[in-house]
Amino acid sequence: MSIKKRLTILFTPILTGLILTALIACGDKPGTTEKTAAGETAAGQRDTPVLPEVKTVPMTEEVTWLTNDAEPLFSSPDAVKGGTFREALLSFPLTFRTVGPDSNSSFRSAILGNQLSLIGIHPNTEQIIPELATHWAYGKDKKTMYFKLNPAARWSDGVPVTAADFAYSLDFMRSKYIVAPWYNDYYTQEIERVDIFDDHTLAVVSTKAQPDLHLRLGISPTPRHFYGQLDDEFVQKYNWKIVPNTGPYQISDFQKGKFVKFKRKKEWWGQDLRYFKHRFNVDRVTYTVVRDMNVLWE
């Protein structure tokens, strides 16, 4: 199966499925709004995580770099920006984590939809198109893909996206501390390693030669500077933290048991790129808990 999270416009009709899935509501006191910036604790103090060492290796294979700016656009220049998109939840998500206990809810797609991958798939032609990587190449062993990152790519807290964030993804997904056996197994059995050549060049190596490597190796980054070294407090510590992302929207406000609000970034690094232009047009998206189906359809 593919681990590629195919980026779609976050607010397509697909997300209407959210109203059909009942989550268990949180028991926090109503009436208290919690707004926590990415990288900060609930008390408003910024964490200073210990960062794992970054190891680089020389790139020894000569490859043919590929890119794709020839696919038809699937957005309209006439699209009007602004406004608020409103969606309903039958109950509030149990966590903002996307891995670990209670994370496998339908609301998770709203968070993952704002985390880009190395490459994307064109929705009409099904050809590879750039996302965080501008170029890619295939190794002769038929199990390695090479990538060149867009130097402009940034996390939502302004930190540059680097090859180290993709190597960190492998360590993160294999960690026992995230309490996610499926991810532990997949990232061990399917991906052998991530090689870092420099800040913007890397290789992702599969455990075996296989067709359609791009569907398996076009992984997403994990913000190394945000998490640092993991420990057994991961599940509780990051339950409600807003993790930096690379996509066009970020959680801006939430009240447990009531609502979650997303806001479009004013200066998103990818807004003028060919396959991102004229998309992601609403300014805000609000998910509101409506527990009564009759009220929901009124």
Positions of PLM-derived features:
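N-terminal lobe/hinge region of extracytoplasmic solute-binding protein
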Residues: 55, 59-74, 83-140, 171, ...
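C-terminal motif of bacterial Sec signal peptides marking the signal peptidase cleavage site
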Residues: 22-25
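Bacterial signal peptide processing site
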Residues: 27-29
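Extracellular/periplasmic solute-recognition and catalytic clefts
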Residues: 176, 180, 193-196, 252-263, ...
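Aromatic- and charge-enriched surface segment that lines or borders ligand/interaction sites
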Residues: 134-179, 197, 203, 296-298
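Short, well-ordered beta-strand elements
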Residues: 82-92, 134, 144-147, 166-170, ...
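Gly/Pro-rich hinge or "lid" segments in bacterial periplasmic/extracellular proteins
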Residues: 109, 115-116, 122-127, 218-284, ...
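Surface-exposed binding/hinge segments that line
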Residues: 184-231, 248, 253-255
